[in-house]
Design a protein with these regions (language model features):
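Arg/Lys-rich, positively charged N-terminal/basic patches that mediate binding to nucleic acids
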Residues: 1-27
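Tryptophan-centered motif/residue detector
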Residues: 10, 28, 42, 73-75
Length: 89
């Protein structure tokens, strides 16, 4: 599976605390090696669009659009911001 990131994702990631950035890198490596790893809780989060989320930590999530064998990650942030994003989709 191929992962890509948007500029907005990279900017949001850069603005997160260092420990969360470290957790995000760890989650990415895990996703790269095994996208179905239970700790990632990788799942579809929209009923009609191919939008998926992955768990970074108990408090942070990443969200991406899935097409073919590629995920384009466009959001990374707190669970509260994640919940707001999902309501807006």
């Amino acid at each position: 599976m191929i992962s890509r990131t948007t500029r907005r994702f990279r900017e949001a990631l850069a603005g997160l605390p260092q420990d969360v950035r470290r957790q995000a890198r760890s989650a990415y490596r895990l996703f790269r090696d095994n996208p179905r790893h239970p700790s990632l809780q990788f799942k579809r989060v929209h009923p009609s669009l191919p939008i998926y989320s992955a768990r970074i930590s108990g408090d942070y999530r990443a969200v991406g659009s899935f097409s073919g064998d590629t995920v384009v990650w466009f959001f990374v942030g707190s669970h509260a911001d994640y919940d707001r994003l999902l309501r807006a989709l």
